[in-house]
């Protein structure tokens, strides 16, 4: 075996070891999550997605199906531009300024009916999408005494500030489960990971 082959083979070994370590850490983190017992029909998934076939919509739909949850969509009163660059021009200053964007009432959603609320958002510039921030801010009193959790789709930045800022808005009146970030580019082929988000956190009776 020459030097070049040795280096190549060692690189492969290190890569596999790193992958295994990552999976081990992921499994260990999941095993440390305290599951919440919830009755069937007492979970709601509330989400915002920029586009009709968006990653966050897919994630929310998959999670709701696994949890046997009711599914509700947050919609901006004035929708963001469907052109990506123009949407960025609108949303970026809102995100950096932690501004609230007006949203429509969610038809049929009565939070009093639910014990667990899972909130879905895209990660925009490291934080919640403004319509999600608006909804959480408007409903933080109604979420008191409930179990809540945020999940997000992202473009590569991971969780960033989303989980932290969600917890800051909610405060200590609700039980907050560990957040979860899903890579947007692969979320539509990550059904098992989306389902594990539910089974790691909830024990549906």
Where are these regions (language model features)?
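N-terminal export signals
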Residues: 5-26
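Glycine-rich phosphate/pyrophosphate-binding loop and the adjoining helix
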Residues: 14, 175-205
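C-terminal segment of N-terminal export signals and the immediately downstream linker at the start
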Residues: 23-53
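Short hydrophobic segments within beta-strands
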Residues: 46-48, 74, 119-120, 151
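Solvent-exposed loop/turn segments at secondary-structure junctions
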Residues: 50-53, 76-79, 123-127, 154-158, ...
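A short, Lys/Arg-enriched amphipathic alpha-helix followed by its capping loop at the start of a domain
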Residues: 59-67
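A short beta-strand-loop structural module common to alpha/beta enzyme folds
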Residues: 69-83
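Helix-loop-strand module that forms the ligand-binding subsite of alpha/beta enzymes
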Residues: 86-174
């Amino acid at each position: 075996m020459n030097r070049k082959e040795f280096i190549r083979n060692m690189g492969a070994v290190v890569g596999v070891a790193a992958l295994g370590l990552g999976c081990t850490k992921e499994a260990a983190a999941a095993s440390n999550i305290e599951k919440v017992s919830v009755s069937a029909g007492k979970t709601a998934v509330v989400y915002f997605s920029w586009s009709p076939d968006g990653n966050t919509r897919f994630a929310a739909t998959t999670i709701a199906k696994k949890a046997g949850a009711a599914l509700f969509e947050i919609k901006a009163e004035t929708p963001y531009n469907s052109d990506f660059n123009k949407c960025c021009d609108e949303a970026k200053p809102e995100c950096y300024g932690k501004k609230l964007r007006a949203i429509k009432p969610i038809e049929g959603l009565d939070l009093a009916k639910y014990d667990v609320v899972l909130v879905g958002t895209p990660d925009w510039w490291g934080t919640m999408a403004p319509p999600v921030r608006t909804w959480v801010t408007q409903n933080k009193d109604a979420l008191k005494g409930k179990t809540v959790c945020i999940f997000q789709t992202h473009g590569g930045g991971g969780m960033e500030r989303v989980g932290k800022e969600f917890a800051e808005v909610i405060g200590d009146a609700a039980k907050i489960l560990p957040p979860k970030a899903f890579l947007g580019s692969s979320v539509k082929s990550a059904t098992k990971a989306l389902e594990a988000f539910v089974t790691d956190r909830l024990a549906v009776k």
